[in-house]
Curated annotation (Swiss-Prot):
Specifically methylates the N7 position of a guanine in 16S rRNA. S-adenosyl-L-methionine binds at G71, F76, A122, E123, R135. This is Ribosomal RNA small subunit methyltransferase G. One of its GO terms (cellular component) is cytosol. It is found in: Cytoplasm. SUPFAM superfamilies: S-adenosyl-L-methionine-dependent methyltransferases. One of its GO terms (molecular function) is rRNA (guanine-N7-)-methyltransferase activity. Coiled coil: none annotated. Its EC number is 2.1.1.-. Keywords: Cytoplasm, Methyltransferase, rRNA processing, S-adenosyl-L-methionine, Transferase. InterPro entries: rRNA_ssu_MeTfrase_G (IPR003682), SAM-dependent_MTases_sf (IPR029063). Belongs to the methyltransferase superfamily. RNA methyltransferase RsmG family. It is an enzyme of class 2 (transferase).
Length: 209
């Protein structure tokens, strides 16, 4: 929890309480449904929560923003971002029902009113969103093909509507067909060596009628 306060010192008392609860909630759920690897669960705050919040260092969501989290797994990056941005609406989806069961359990325990969680494929999602977030669920060309028709036309942020994607390693080959993509190195924001090769990729996408 200390690493969260280090990089996000202006949290409200409620946000601090919610972030603190995540430790118990995920350890408890993980004993029943394995959504976080055994070797990573004890590094929950660094490898999952702080990593998710890397998006918040790139983009401050304005009130009323809508965000789709594709392949949310146990709720990352959606749940940490929903705690940080209570006036932003988050829609978390995953194709695996037991993962959504965990997500819903955590959301209910935290009383997050700005989160909807559902078992669904990205291609079947109705509606459009300001931003679509994810954490390395697939390669970028496939990801874009899933969600390219789900971006809102009107922009209200400095960064244009589109994808905010958490991924590590050398992305040059994967992004060669996306010259509009901008990479933000999390190693320049967070000190832990875990973030040495981790990045946030912003890929603006035009509205597709």
């Amino acid at each position: 929890m200390d690493e969260i306060l280090k990089y996000f010192p202006n949290l409200t008392d409620l946000q601090i309480e919610q972030f603190q609860k995540l430790d118990f909630l995920y350890h408890n759920w993980n004993e029943k449904i394995n959504v976080i690897s055994r070797k990573d669960i004890d590094s929950l705050y660094t490898k999952h929560i702080l990593h998710s919040l890397g998006i918040a260092k790139v983009m401050k969501f304005e009130p009323g923003t809508t965000v789709l989290d594709v392949g949310t797994g146990g709720g990352f990056p959606g749940i940490p971002l929903a705690i940080l941005f209570p006036e932003t609406r988050f829609y978390l989806i995953d194709v695996i029902a037991k993962k959504i069961k965990v997500v819903q359990g955590v959301v209910d325990a935290l009383e997050l009113k700005n989160v909807k969680a559902e078992q669904k494929r990205a291609e079947l999602v109705k509606g459009d969103f300001d931003f679509i977030v994810s954490r390395a669920v697939t390669n970028m060309p496939d990801f874009v093909s899933w969600i390219k028709d789900k971006i809102k036309k009107q922009h209200k942020h400095k960064l244009k509507n589109g994808i905010l994607y958490l991924k590590g390693g050398d992305l040059s080959e994967e992004l060669k067909d996306f010259p509009a993509a901008t990479l933000y190195d999390l190693s320049e924001i967070f000190e832990d060596e875990f973030f040495e090769t981790k990045k946030v990729v912003h890929l603006p996408l035009k509205f597709k009628p």
